[in-house]
């Protein structure tokens, strides 16, 4: 895979998209101005013609070194999804930048056409289908200053994800119990 094999899908409602200036000219770019992030990304995939798709936010900047590294990762892991690490404790990627083959998208299905959190839900479906997520530190890509999301929206997102994937609750509880068992001194539990 080379740069020319990638289409960058950028959802935006801004007249000037900062990200475009750091995308090499040999790449294809599809800017989508649909209402929700999920719908815009899905429309971008439909309009793209390349084997590889990169989701990118409209307010980031890539370095040539980052793109070279991502291409190397993709060539070594063609059946994985590569992206920026989510916010702890989430094991999922964020769509500020995410790269994958079109065939993976087709297998997982389109993103939910919501405003926020669509990539987390998509990554959950991806892992359930056996795809590996390769996380790159978020700091690898410059993110221009912007307004932060509201805490209440993050809580709504968690409840929405749990309503779609209730098995996450059980998996989370199992992980907590496992960590407690592995990290606690046996002395703590003696009477």
Language-model-derived ranges and their functions:
Residues 116-122:
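Acidic donor-binding loop at a coil-to-helix junction in glycosyltransferase catalytic cores
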Residues 65-92:
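Conserved donor NDP-sugar-binding/catalytic core segment of glycosyltransferases
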Residues 125-141:
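Catalytic donor-sugar/metal-binding loop of nucleotide-sugar-dependent glycosyltransferases
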Residues 57-61:
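The conserved acidic donor/metal-binding loop of glycosyltransferases
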Residues 34-48:
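Glycine-rich, basic loop-to-helix element that forms the pyrophosphate-binding segment
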Residues 53:
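Short aromatic/hydrophobic "clamp" motif used to bind/position activated sugar donors
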Residues 136-154:
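Active-site donor/metal-binding and catalytic loop motifs
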Residues 1-24:
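N-proximal low-complexity "stem/linker" segments adjacent to membrane-targeting elements
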């Amino acid at each position: 895979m080379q740069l020319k094999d990638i289409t960058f899908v950028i959802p935006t409602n801004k007249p000037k998209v900062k990200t475009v200036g750091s995308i090499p000219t040999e790449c294809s770019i599809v800017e989508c101005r649909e209402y929700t992030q999920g719908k815009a990304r899905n429309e971008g995939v439909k309009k793209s013609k390349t084997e590889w798709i990169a989701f990118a936010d409209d307010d980031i900047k890539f370095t040539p070194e980052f793109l070279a590294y991502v291409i190397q990762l993709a060539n070594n892991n063609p059946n994985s999804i590569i992206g920026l690490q989510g916010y702890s404790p989430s094991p999922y990627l964020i769509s500020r930048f995410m790269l994958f083959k079109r065939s993976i998208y087709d297998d997982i299905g389109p993103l939910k056409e919501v405003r926020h959190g669509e990539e987390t839900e998509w990554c959950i479906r991806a892992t359930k289908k056996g795809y590996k997520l390769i996380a790159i530190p978020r700091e690898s890509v410059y993110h221009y200053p912007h307004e932060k999301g509201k805490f209440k929206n993050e809580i709504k997102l968690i409840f929405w994800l749990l309503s779609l994937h209730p098995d996450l609750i059980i998996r989370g509880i199992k992980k907590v119990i496992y960590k407690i068992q592995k990290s606690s001194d046996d002395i703590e539990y003696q009477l």
